[in-house]
């Protein structure tokens, strides 16, 4: 077995503190206590760049049965959470390794001000090179859409409600689903800023259809 006693990495108010014992037994565990740890730094360590997440993570990550059939999970609060460079407030996430399907399951809620909220439920499978994150938007900041629509729009300042999925091969991720949005955006090819109210958007692989819009 492997024993870890208060292994600490610290910088200013940030820290990672690791304690516990790793063995084939499910009764033994390694616990990492995190405070204000840069999420982007963690993703760089594991070489995951298919989807951009950022923010400062605080919480605990636990690994059991490290030398047998590993079981890993984490409960984290992430301040200043960014999804594809779009701010979504504070993310409260439960992440666990699904041994049966060999994927990372994610259940999370991102809270912004004024009751705006984003609910995330899905998985990432490095083994199958696949992602499927269901997103329920309730007044969600749509800045993250620029990463999917950057070829024809930018400067998105809008909020939306509806359901979409970030889905597909990790080398070619798509957005599918339906939302209703109010705000403004800049159409790059026309060099024109559009304002819209209750714009209905239907996302399909590699395309977004706009319906019943008032501009």
PLM features: residue spans?
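Interface amphipathic segments
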Residues: 1-215
